[in-house]
Amino acid sequence: MSYLIPYVIEQTNRGERSYDIYSRLLKDRIVFLGTPIDDQVANVVIAQLLFLESEDPDKPVNLYINSPGGSVSAGLGIYDAMQHIKSPVNTTVVGMAASMAALLLAAGTGKRYALPNARVMIHQPHLSGVGGQVTDIEITAREAVKTKQLMAEILAKHSGQSVERILADTERDRWMSAQEAVEYGLVDEVLHPREKASRSAR
């Protein structure tokens, strides 16, 4: 199902200029990951991260996430780019960060945020479409075990949990509320609505 991407019209000294909404957000150093993660999506996100670093390596990048996860290899490509660039990457989950997207949320190199009703889910990598000769299946299974260990080590590094705890908790889908994600170490802070926060401070 396709949907229309909104355009924003801005006035410049040369007249009107239109941007698709994602390009306009990029001007403010905002990258939005709002789809399942595949190779094409990962390439776009990585390109945006590299571009923003080249623009100003000292300014933070804000990565907003609303994704059910997806390809492990594609997600690890985004993860490596986040760790590679000099610009700090703040991550914020809006809606959902599940599976590979939860790892990217936790791996923010700046601040890591969740909106109040966001959900976070971690689990072990899934095998799909496995077939062929027994030897090929054995090779795939060994690679899957290595990937499971790698993902657990990355989550442990960024959450402060032990690898053993991560492995145990990801045996099945582990869903968390925004506050539970803070307590688990995947998120630093829950962002509450600005107006209510400012009223309560009076």
Curated annotation (Swiss-Prot):
It catalyses: Hydrolysis of proteins to small peptides in the presence of ATP and magnesium. alpha-casein is the usual test substrate. In the absence of ATP, only oligopeptides shorter than five residues are hydrolyzed (such as succinyl-Leu-Tyr-|-NHMec, and Leu-Tyr-Leu-|-Tyr-Trp, in which cleavage of the -Tyr-|-Leu- and -Tyr-|-Trp bonds also occurs). It is found in: Cytoplasm. GO terms for cellular component: cytoplasm; endopeptidase Clp complex. It comes from the Bacteria. The keyword Protease applies. One of its GO terms (biological process) is protein quality control for misfolded or incompletely synthesized proteins. It holds the Pfam family CLP_protease. Keywords: Cytoplasm, Hydrolase, Protease, Serine protease. One of its GO terms (molecular function) is ATP-dependent peptidase activity. Its main location: cytoplasm. Its EC number is 3.4.21.92. Fourteen ClpP subunits assemble into 2 heptameric rings which stack back to back to give a disk-like structure with a central cavity, resembling the structure of eukaryotic proteasomes. Belongs to the peptidase S14 family. Cleaves peptides in various proteins in a process that requires ATP hydrolysis. Has a chymotrypsin-like activity. Plays a major role in the degradation of misfolded proteins. This is ATP-dependent Clp protease proteolytic subunit 1. It comes from Symbiobacterium thermophilum (strain DSM 24528 / JCM 14929 / IAM 14863 / T).
